[in-house]
């Protein structure tokens, strides 16, 4: 995989983030018939489940901001010739409604180090790079392009399920991201696109309950199971 080996003594990042995740992957593989492909699945599900409360918090913040959009548009129209007054009144509205416009960013910022650490734990684990799962060598690109296709397809599904929550410009990206994922997955060691497939599939199911047809019921179920922990 051409990555530096994981050394718990090399710094805080490896010691407290990457190394524990790598050891967790090894432990699950040992208890799952030596299958690192299954270990990556289990660890991905655990991490995504643990950050589910953050995802729900991000959703609630986004939903509240959407509910305020009519009022925000009125303020923009009313003070279209006075940018300073428009900003002041908008912030006043946020304060009155108890909304922090940056609140939706905080969960994402917290999630990113964990997900990057998981990426490093997978890509820098020599045991994973030498392991074979199903038809693929986890340390080498998929020669049959099955995994890149699955990664691209699940990325598209993820974007499709969440498309109702983004603007028209962002919707155009739902056709670009899968292509980029396919190209990258063609050249990356199979362990990484395998993680993408698992993570995307989790997001598709999660997003269906959050954003899908049974929106309110799904949110209530998720909040009861994980959103308020």
Locate predicted features:
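Helix-loop-helix
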Residues: 1-229
């Amino acid at each position: 995989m051409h990555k530096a080996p994981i050394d718990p003594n090399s710094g805080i990042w490896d010691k407290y983030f990457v190394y524990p995740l790598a050891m967790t992957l090894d432990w699950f593989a040992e208890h799952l018939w030596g299958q690192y492909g299954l270990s990556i699945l289990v660890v991905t599900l655990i991490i995504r489940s643990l950050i589910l409360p953050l995802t729900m918090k991000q959703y609630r913040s986004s939903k509240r901001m959407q509910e305020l959009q009519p009022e925000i548009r009125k303020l923009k129209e009313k003070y279209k010739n006075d940018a300073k007054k428009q900003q002041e009144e908008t912030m006043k509205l946020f304060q009155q409604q108890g909304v922090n416009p940056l609140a939706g960013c905080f969960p994402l910022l917290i999630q990113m180090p964990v997900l990057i650490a998981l990426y490093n734990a997978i890509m820098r684990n020599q045991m994973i790079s030498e392991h074979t799962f199903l038809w693929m060598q986890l340390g080498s690109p998929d020669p049959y392009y099955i995994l890149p296709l699955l990664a691209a397809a699940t990325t598209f599904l993820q974007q499709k399920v969440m498309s109702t929550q983004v603007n028209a410009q962002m919707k155009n990206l739902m056709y670009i991201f899968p292509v980029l994922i396919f190209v990258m997955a063609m050249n990356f060691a199979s362990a990484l696109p395998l993680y993408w497939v698992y993570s995307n599939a989790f997001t598709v199911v999660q997003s269906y309950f959050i954003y899908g047809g049974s929106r309110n019921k799904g949110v209530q179920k998720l909040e009861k199971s994980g959103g308020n922990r």
